Design a protein with these regions (language model features):
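Hydrophobic, glycine/alanine-rich multi-pass transmembrane helices and their short helix-loop junctions
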Residues: 333-338, 356-373, 422-473
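Interfacial helix-loop-helix hairpins and adjacent transmembrane helices
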Residues: 1, 407-411, 441-447, 466-496
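Internal alpha-helical transmembrane segments of multi-pass membrane proteins, especially GPCRs
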Residues: 317-325, 347-350, 378, 414, ...
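Hydrophobic alpha-helical transmembrane segments of multi-pass small-molecule transporters/permeases
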Residues: 35, 47, 79, 273, ...
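Helix-loop junctions and hydrophobic alpha-helical segments within the transmembrane domains
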Residues: 306, 313, 317, 393, ...
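Alpha-helical transmembrane segments and their helix-entry boundary regions
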Residues: 162, 181, 315, 344-347, ...
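Membrane-proximal extracytoplasmic
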Residues: 1-329, 337-338, 370, 444
Length: 496
């Protein structure tokens, strides 16, 4: 009953566990991203990069600091020692950046602090383009991806983000005319200050509306380019001019920063990322269903899958499972050849499924997934899972040759060989367990390898000590004495 419950729980855990390519690991590498649009590289280096570097370089556990300056953006990566706690590293970097925020340019956006992880990888990549006969332009397709597709896919379980590649973004462009500005004595600072204020939402306190207290907000946005052209710009001398008098205001698209093409044709692409702990196969399955719904609801746009990173994961999973089955089959064949008794082989090889299946329950308990590392570990130890049972069954066979009944032989043989079986098992544990405590980046992967092997080996010990003697007592048959009075069977040519 115990092993039936463990096997049932293991099967349920196997079905409920997620399939991944490799385990999700988090490295103690923290990234600080700061943006100052329009700034020159030299300005970014002196006013942003060096100040952020100096702030984080003195933190405890820092190994290296890398900084990249590109097109108005500064990215600083702080690498800590592997022993550093990731939440502590994030808090330390965030506090250090907050401490120098007052020394950074006031017009820059607040820096963002994020941690590095192997979880956020692309699972699927799609392209979107107008269908034949559709009137949609690139701007409409881009808006469809940003608004409709992204919202629908982010509702799929396991989807972490949807990123558009290529396409265009709407932009209200203001092109200043220096001659008219000089004639009306308007500076670019006046225009910039007014544009910032017109796009700002701010709380306006509380007011009495209809006898009830209501929150009030100040909304100062414009909806169209025509509204923006009519915007009044106050000047220092008390005058005001309209923006359209000193600039050309147009509703257009921003300059593309990325391009997506398929078969030489420009399209709009989007990538689907998974979250930490989610499986590529589950995310791909849910994303495909969501895209199929979007395609059926919007026939005017054509959604095409171009990259499927979940398919190699499926192939690796199936290959690992086939390797596990082949290893188990060969182990059974070898045991049958040397035991030369199908009943003894059945008892010994029952340890294989009864050790592997409960291991999946242990994987779920530790939060491990079905990935290349854990399945490789099971395939590697599948041959040693029958060792304890073989030792037990061989000693039981020896007692049967003495003329004892199967029940008596099983009880006496199990008591006689118990310490040897336990010693063999813990010798194997001593071999595999240290891999779970390896240092460095490889140790983050081999942690699951070592614990998976140890769980399976300990499960095989449980089977050998509890189940194998019981099965032998009821399945094995007593040896019938031959005419010469011997109970041993002839060894044959293989054992000579």
């Amino acid at each position: 009953m115990l092993f039936a419950l463990l096997s049932l729980a293991g099967l349920l855990a196997f079905r409920g566990n997620v399939v991944q390519d490799f385990p999700d690991i988090e490295l103690p590498m923290i990234t600080v991203s700061a943006s100052l649009p329009g700034a020159a590289p030299a300005q970014l280096e002196t006013e942003l990069a060096r100040k952020i570097e100096d702030a984080v370089a003195t933190l405890a556990g820092v190994k290296n600091v890398y900084t990249t300056v590109l097109d108005g953006n500064v990215t600083t990566t702080v690498e800590f020692a592997l022993e550093k706690s990731i939440p502590e590293a994030v808090n330390d970097v965030r506090d250090a950046v907050a401490g120098v925020r007052a020394d950074l340019p006031g017009e820059m956006r607040d820096p963002t602090v994020s941690k590095a992880s192997t979880a956020g990888r692309v699972v699927l990549t799609y392209t979107a383009q107008p269908a034949a006969g559709s009137s949609w332009d690139p701007q409409a397709v881009s808006w469809f991806v940003d608004n409709t597709v992204s919202k629908r896919l982010r509702a799929v379980r396991g989807v972490g983000a949807v990123k558009r590649v290529g396409g265009v973004s709407r932009e209200v462009r203001v092109e200043l005319h220096p001659d008219q500005m000089a004639a009306l004595r308007v500076s670019a600072v006046d225009v910039s200050r007014r544009l910032k204020s017109v796009q700002q939402d701010a709380p306006g306190g509380r007011g009495d509306v209809g006898g009830a207290e209501q929150s009030v907000r100040t909304i100062a946005t414009v909806q169209t380019a025509e509204d923006l052209a009519l915007l009044d710009i106050p000047l220092a001398d008390g005058r005001s001019v309209r923006l359209g008098e000193v600039a050309s205001v147009s509703d257009t698209v921003a300059e593309p920063r990325s391009l997506a093409t398929i078969n030489g044709k420009t399209v709009v692409g989007f990538e689907v990322f998974r979250t930490k702990g989610a499986g590529e196969l589950d995310v791909a399955r849910g994303a495909r269903a969501a895209v199929a719904e979007l395609q059926a609801a919007h026939p005017q746009v054509l959604l095409t899958q171009v990259i499927d990173n979940a398919h190699p994961v499926q192939e690796n999973f199936e290959g690992s499972m086939e390797l596990l089955y082949e290893g188990a089959g060969l182990a059974v064949l070898v045991v049958l050849i040397f035991l030369r008794n199908w009943r003894a082989t059945l008892v010994a090889c029952a340890a294989l499924p009864l050790s592997v299946i409960p291991t999946f329950l242990g994987l779920q308990y530790f939060g491990y997934t079905l990935n290349t590392v854990t399945l490789l570990s099971l395939a590697l130890v599948v041959g040693v899972l029958v060792d304890d049972a073989i030792v037990e069954i061989e000693n039981i066979e020896r007692h049967l040759r003495m003329g004892k009944s199967p029940y008596q032989a099983a009880m006496e043989a199990a008591d006689e060989i118990g310490m040897a079986v336990i010693a063999t098992t813990f010798a194997l544990v001593a071999v595999f367990l240290p891999t779970a405590f390896m240092g460095g980046v490889p140790g983050l992967f081999f942690k699951q390898f070592g614990w998976t092997a140890v769980i399976a080996i300990l499960a095989s010990l449980l089977v050998a000590r509890l189940l194998t003697p019981m099965m032998a007592a009821y399945i094995l048959q007593p040896h019938v004495p031959r005419a010469d009075g011997q109970t041993d069977d002839p060894d044959g040519w293989m054992m000579r």
